[in-house]
Design a protein with these regions (language model features):
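Bacterial N-terminal signal peptides that target proteins for export
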Residues: 1-11
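Catalytic glycan-binding domains that act on GlcNAc-containing polysaccharides
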Residues: 48-277, 293-296, 305-344, 366, ...
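Short acidic, glycine/serine/threonine-rich helix-capping segments at coil-helix boundaries
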Residues: 342-347, 355-399
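Intrinsically disordered, low-complexity polar regions and short flexible loop motifs
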Residues: 43
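C-terminal segment of classical bacterial N-terminal signal peptides
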Residues: 16-25
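Intrinsically disordered, low-complexity Ser/Thr/Pro/Gly-rich interaction regions
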Residues: 281-282
């Protein structure tokens, strides 16, 4: 069977199961079994046989471990050095190169069809499941049903539960076989059920989409998903760059976009001093560890990687790992020695202090997000520090001394 005949959006086999979007969210405190019946009703409206839903929900109880994991708040904010350093290791690079060589024919065929370079499929595989060595052992139907009925994200996970039932209805696997992370991500590439349904590919043509044991299906699904969420050749996702002396640090932000050639005209070069591509594609410069750490240019494909996972540090990890799997050099500029995570309480204190200075007006949540970094940048400008939006120990000390 040629690739065009193989299912990508499950078009041929899902016509029976197509249906309307999920209805309104469930009221706080709804009984678990009652909640399951509401989800079943939504699923049957989308074509799932009632017997399939009944079998999937038979004896199902909420998973308290999933509830606990969902409610757990991180004690410390993530930093570039800790996150990327843990995701991009020499061992992971070497294994990625070995697996890319092992599956080269398949990966080259997928690149020709979908436009996604092999090293990116390998990088996602490496970051998501360490090349398939740990795909999670939670029962997916139980996990997503628990999250739908016992947490605040009812709409999202109710839909994921319906999509999991649709997967069962199409005989891709049994409830017991459908295992993944506590949040419902499945298989080598950790697809949510809705992602499986929309972007899954039966590359082998056996009538089933198997993201667990069929690497052709898993890799093709990843390539199809990436193309669907915006990947376009030929530029990579990102590259390390060197900034010229006097570069305006307030321009190093994802909200600032310029054509690649405009950054080149400002004196930005690739790390190692090679010229940037001659391109009019929109791009941004970021400093994930502040002005003393590495700088990167983000090309449009970085947004595609972010559409897979909304974490900038996750996307940086995938981009850096892909570059090194393809034989590129490690990042040349290391992070500063004091690139240490801030505790949640420390971020809350910082947000409160910035709010008293009328620089921060958003929710005090203990998260070092874009709005908090913007407020940090404003105060850095006021006190004469480099305005890179990163709260260094000196910044924190100066802020605590402010009256």
């Amino acid at each position: 069977m040629n690739s065009l005949a193989k299912t990508t959006l499950l078009a041929a086999t899902t016509a029976l199961l197509a249906g309307p979007a999920l209805g309104p969210s469930y009221a706080q405190g709804t009984d678990f079994q009652s909640c399951l019946q509401t989800i079943k009703a939504d699923a049957t409206r989308q074509g799932v046989p009632a017997a399939i839903a009944d079998r999937a929900f038979q004896g199902l109880t909420p998973d308290q471990k999933v509830v606990d994991l969902d409610s757990r708040q991180p004690e410390f904010s993530l930093t570039y050095s800790k996150y990327v350093g843990g995701a991009v290791t020499p061992d992971r690079v070497t294994k990625g190169q070995q697996r890319m060589a092992q599956h080269r024919a398949l990966l080259d065929a997928l690149q020709a069809e979908y436009g996604v370079p092999p090293q990116y499929i390998m990088a996602f595989w490496g970051v998501e499941t360490n090349y398939g060595t740990f795909m999670g052992d939670f029962q997916v139907v139980r996990s997503v049903a628990t999250l739908a009925c016992m947490t605040k994200r009812r709409d999202f996970f109710s839909n994921e539960t319906v999509q999991a039932l649709r997967i069962l209805a199409m005989n891709h696997m049994t409830r017991e076989q459908m295992r993944g992370s506590w949040a419902g991500a499945m298989g080598n590439m950790q697809f949510m059920p809705s992602t499986f349904m929309k972007w899954g590919v039966d590359r082998t043509g056996d009538g089933r989409i198997d993201l667990w044991t069929s690497l052709p299906d898993a890799f093709a699904s990843a390539a199809n998903f990436l193309r669907g969420i915006g990947w376009k050749p030929p530029l990579p996702a990102s590259e390390e760059v060197f900034l010229p002396q006097g570069f305006p640090l307030d321009q190093a932000d994802t909200t600032v976009e310029k054509p690649v050639r405009a950054w080149a005209q400002m004196g930005v070069k690739k790390a190692g001093s090679a010229a940037l591509p001659s391109s009019d594609e929109p791009s941004s410069i970021i400093l994930p560890a502040g002005h003393r750490g590495p700088a990167f240019i983000l090309y449009p494909n970085f947004k595609a990687v972010m559409n897979w996972n909304r974490s900038t540090l996750y996307a940086m990890s995938v981009a850096i790992l892909a570059q090194q799997i393809a034989g590129g050099a490690p990042v040349m500029q290391g992070p500063p020695a004091d690139d240490e995570p801030l505790s949640r309480d420390a971020v809350i204190d910082m947000q409160n202090r910035l709010a008293r200075l009328t620089l921060y007006t958003d929710e005090v949540d203990g998260l070092l997000g874009p709005k908090t970094r913007s407020a940090v940048r404003l105060y850095q400008k006021q006190i004469g520090l480099p305005a890179d939006g990163h709260p260094t120990p000196e910044f924190v000390r100066r802020l605590q001394q402010a009256r």
